[in-house]
Regions:
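Short, polar/charged loop or turn motifs at beta-strand boundaries
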Residues: 18-24, 117-119
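Non-catalytic interaction modules of co-chaperones and other macromolecular assembly/maintenance factors
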Residues: 5, 24-30, 37
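Domain-wide signal for the mature, well-folded portions of proteins, strongly enriched
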Residues: 8-9, 13, 27-31, 70
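GHKL (Bergerat-fold) ATPase N-terminal catalytic module, capturing the glycine-rich phosphate-binding loop
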Residues: 1-15, 21-22
Length: 181
């Protein structure tokens, strides 16, 4: 658990430089998102955000983060959570997803790459959605059912996390992954 002065700790201070940033006021919500994602991936770490002597502690596991960020209050009934983990020697991908049975039908998809929340998705999200649409369309066709590919996304709740050696992003803000594979 977090202690004020632990024997093994690292303190990082963020002070924006007006030579680099347009605004000297940091985006606290973005920092919160990054700390939440980092706390999931760095399982033994406790992360603390201290703003004007108000401390927020981040120590989440992947299921807790999924439930907190991917599910809405109206998602009281869901399918079983599916967890897929694929890893090669250096890179890895984990996808957690389920379907809401009674919440909004709009899909809710969150993702991160190397501890960085990727708000606008990218190739990894598109690939996952294409796989789901193809899977459901193929199964429906074999069963003799009519099925629109987008229906595979109705009620989808998903969190995708990647660890890549050379991620490529669409811009300086790193809000969309553009790697080809």
């Amino acid at each position: 658990s977090y202690k004020e002065n632990p024997p093994f700790s690292t303190k990082i201070q963020f002070k924006p430089d007006k030579k680099i940033f347009e605004s000297l006021i940091p985006d606290i919500d973005r920092l919160r998102k990054r700390l939440a994602v980092a706390s999931v991936e760095l399982k033994d770490a406790t992360l603390v955000l201290n703003v004007d002597d108000n401390k927020e502690i981040f120590r989440l596991d992947s299921i807790g983060y999924f439930n907190q960020e991917c599910l809405n209050d109206s998602d009281t009934e869901t399918t079983k959570l599916i967890d897929i983990f694929v890893e090669d020697s250096i890179e890895s991908m984990e996808v957690k997803f389920c379907y809401s049975l009674n919440g909004t039908i709009a899909p809710r998809i969150l993702s991160s790459v190397n501890l960085l929340p990727v708000d606008s998705g990218g190739t990894h999200v598109n690939m996952f959605l294409d796989i789901l649409k193809e899977l459901f369309t193929t199964k429906a066709k074999k069963a003799g059912l009519k099925f629109q590919p987008y229906d595979a996304l109705c009620g989808l709740r998903s969190y995708i996390t990647l660890k890549l050696t050379k991620p490529e992003f669409s811009g300086q803000t790193k809000d969309k992954l553009i790697n080809r594979k």
